[in-house]
A protein has these predicted regions:
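Hydrophobic, low-acid, alpha-helix-prone terminal segments
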Residues: 161-171
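An anion/phosphate-binding loop that grips the pyrophosphate of nucleotide cofactors and donors
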Residues: 60
């Protein structure tokens, strides 16, 4: 399967932060049998971001995005993904309730930027963030998979790794031509 990694955020293009996520994800995907054919970085511009996502969905089976899930004005990744897929962008009430509990436990006021974190592409499978507010998601559409994840490298490498390994275990079982059962060891390797 062909994979593409897209990192979002103008701060990457300005050189303000290091793009560790692409390197780590490329290594992980290649270890799990994917061919990472493209890595793209796009700034916080909704039209360019939507265009990049559309192009990726045409040429890759699995598209993983990194960034743009937080509670700031610049976090437009989820909306651009929904536009690229031609699917509605909707509020997930159960995610809003989880977020309200999360912010309340820290005594933080519930405001519009936090509410935006509860919006996802219609039909998305949420991957709750157990160590923060921004959840990731998986969107399966017309045989393609668009995966959105956190920008923070420590969340990706630790909390998210288990979820990602479970996701790839499922994909490996259903993406092989013989459709045979596969096993995943504690390091995520399949046989």
């Amino acid at each position: 399967m062909i994979a593409e990694i897209i990192t979002t955020g103008t701060e990457l293009l300005l050189g303000e932060i290091t793009n560790e996520n692409s390197q780590w994800l490329a290594s992980f995907l290649n270890e799990h049998g994917y061919t990472v054919a493209y890595m793209t970085t796009v700034g916080d511009n909704p039209d360019r971001m939507t265009s990049v996502f559309r192009q990726a969905l045409e040429r890759a089976d699995l598209v993983i995005t990194s960034g743009g899930l937080g509670a700031t004005q610049g976090d437009i990744t989820k909306q651009a993904g929904a536009r690229a897929l031609g699917l509605p962008f909707v509020k997930f009430p159960e995610e809003e309730q989880r977020l309200r509990r999360y912010y309340a436990q820290y005594g933080r006021k519930w405001q519009e930027p936090q509410e935006r974190q509860a919006w996802f592409t219609e039909g998305a499978e949420l991957l709750p963030n157990e160590n923060g507010s921004a959840s990731g998601c998986i969107v399966r559409h017309q045989g393609k998979i668009l995966r959105r994840k956190h920008k923070s490298s420590h969340i990706i490498k630790f909390d998210f790794l288990h979820k990602l390994q479970q996701f790839f275990k499922i994909l490996f079982c259903f993406s092989r031509k013989s459709y045979h059962q596969c096993r995943t060891d504690s390091h995520g390797h399949t046989d």
